[in-house]
A protein has these predicted regions:
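A conserved structural/catalytic subdomain of Rossmann-like adenosyl-cofactor enzymes
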Residues: 18-20, 24-206
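S-adenosyl-L-methionine
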Residues: 1-26
Length: 206
């Protein structure tokens, strides 16, 4: 699978959020890549508040939207020197309540490294716009890079496609971590705080 030999794969069938990864196997990883079901309902039972994946945030994501539950699950299993990328709907960037509290905590810790807006209609399962949230545990500052790649794609009938040149532009902006007019902006923590920890991309890239 994706050039990873079968001997290096460990697959389990179960409810990721209800039953965490077994402790008799490696539980922290250099890279975590996730594309979970968007805004799926889950069992937000009170006992999860003592689960180490969620305990430090003191609030559970709402039962009607498991987006941040998946994010925190993956983030917990990330090594301190690792990088995580998760594809999520844009609502995670600005919704309030418990999600807003979790987002604010992550930002204050410097854990959110970048937000990349993707074109709508690039996944076969949904036509809604999505974004990639990149997280790190060892980030030395609290700046966040915003990339708006939502307008650059090839359209083919009912689907949109990212071509190599589109991916390369995203990669270069991510690597350089600098402003690109109408495409990328490196926002300071003060700027984000003044926006009440709202990460909606048009607030930073217009």
């Amino acid at each position: 699978l994706h050039r990873v030999p079968g001997t290096h794969q460990h697959l389990r069938n179960g409810d990721t959020l209800d039953a965490d990864w077994p402790t008799d196997e490696p539980t922290n990883f250099d890279a975590v890549v996730m594309n979970p079901p968007y805004s799926q309902k889950y069992d937000a039972k009170e006992s999860l508040l003592s689960d180490p994946r969620f305990a430090q945030f003191r609030k559970l994501p709402p039962a009607s939207k498991a987006d941040y539950a998946f994010l925190l699950h993956g983030f917990y299993h990330l090594k301190n020197t690792g990088t995580m990328g998760i594809v999520l709907p844009h609502g995670v960037l600005f919704r309030g309540g418990a999600e807003g509290t979790i987002r604010e905590t992550l930002l204050k810790k410097g854990s959110i490294y970048a937000v990349i807006g993707l074109p709508a209609g690039i996944f076969f399962s949904t036509g809604i716009p999505t974004c990639i949230v990149v997280l790190k545990k060892d980030n030395t500052n609290r700046d966040v890079l915003f990339i708006d790649a939502s307008k650059e794609f090839r359209k083919d009938r009912a689907k949109n496609f990212l071509e190599p040149e589109h991916i390369e532009k995203i990669f270069n902006a991510y690597k350089n971590r600098a402003d690109v007019e109408k495409y990328a902006h490196l926002a300071t923590f003060d700027e984000i705080e003044k926006n009440d920890f709202n990460l909606n991309i048009p607030r930073y890239v217009d």
